[in-house]
Amino acid sequence: MKYSSEFRDKTIAQGLARAIDAEVSSQRAYRFVEFCGGHTHAISRYGLEDLLPANVRMIHGPGCPVCVLPASRIDMAIRLAERPEVILCVYGDLMRAPGSQGQSLLLAKALGAHIRMVYSTLDAIRLAEQTPGREVVFFAIGFETTTPPTAVMIRIAEHKRLEGLSVFCNHVLTPSAMHRILENPKIRNTGGVPIDGFIGPAHVSTIVGTQPYEPMAEQFEKPIVVAGFEPLDVLQAVLMLVRQVNQNRHEVENQYSRAVTREGNRRAKEEVSQVFELREQFEWRGLGLVPNSGLKLKQSYAKFDAETRFAIHDLRVADNPACECCAILRGAKRPIDCKLFGNICTPETPIGACMVSSEGACAAYWTYRRVRDEQARQTS
């Protein structure tokens, strides 16, 4: 089994769609949040919403690390990169993420800031070795999936005594964000619509396992199904959620058992726990300040913390009021509800983070809905 084409089988997908249609009750609505941006793209790419009954609604969640990074953190990174001694190492999908007042790392680079696009933490290590007289700062971002490589990088830097390497840490935690959505009525009732369940993230769950979701499912009485990214994965997860709702169950189920266990990746979690600890709170675009949702370096590794080394402090900046990215990340609105979408906000000229990132909901709508519209025009 190749674990790809088999999970895109059209006949099986149609069978799952019929099963969902047979199980849903016409007397109620079903509203499920797909937390991960990868699921949002799968739903858009394969047109899965078109296969679901009208009373089953998929709500896009804040599962895109570039999208949820607030503009203030981009501004802080730009200030770092403008220092003459600093070389800022950045993953490519961050380069166009919007800061305040139209700023971005790409624009800052064009204006002379020392910014290098990297593909892995190893690139930052090599650069620090090659430029001993400079301060190499790695812009660490992402959920639990990308945190272990950052932890390993810091331990390598300590072992090699790379005094010129530091980390601007923006790693965030998925369970904390899910908890925030469920505990906050203004967020939980997305646009006045309650949430009935979650499709849990795939890649994140390979690291953390399914156990962290269990207290939430019990406390808030909401079913959670961890699912893979293929179309059959998503459809099966929806079917599992529908059955739980119908049976008044609120359990954590693992549809993605071919990659996810209850315990997760113990070695990866150990690497992270050696280097990082919880922040008291961290700001998320769309969710505000979320308690215990971000990571920082432990005191024993504080010498590698760029925020400490360069004495940079949190900023508070307002988002573009015309952009609905914050509401989209909360699930209160969809990309097509934003008046900028497809007009002045496109992948070529993005205004909001949801259009910049390859995992953003706006990027998914733009890419796949345009493709389907074009296909429809060609066949009409």
From Swiss-Prot:
Fe cation binds at residues 36, 64, 67. Keywords: 4Fe-4S, Iron, Iron-sulfur, Metal-binding. Pathway: Protein modification; [NiFe] hydrogenase maturation. The keyword Secreted does not apply. GO terms for molecular function: 4 iron, 4 sulfur cluster binding; carbon monoxide binding; iron ion binding. It comes from the Bacteria. GO terms for biological process: protein maturation. Its cofactor is [4Fe-4S] cluster. Gene3D superfamilies: 6.10.20.100, HypD, alpha/beta domain 1. InterPro entries: Hyd_form_HypD, HypD_1, HypD_2_sf. Involved in the maturation of [NiFe] hydrogenases. Involved in the biosynthesis of the Fe(CN)(2)CO cofactor. Belongs to the HypD family. This is Hydrogenase maturation factor HypD1. It comes from Bradyrhizobium diazoefficiens (strain JCM 10833 / BCRC 13528 / IAM 13628 / NBRC 14792 / USDA 110).
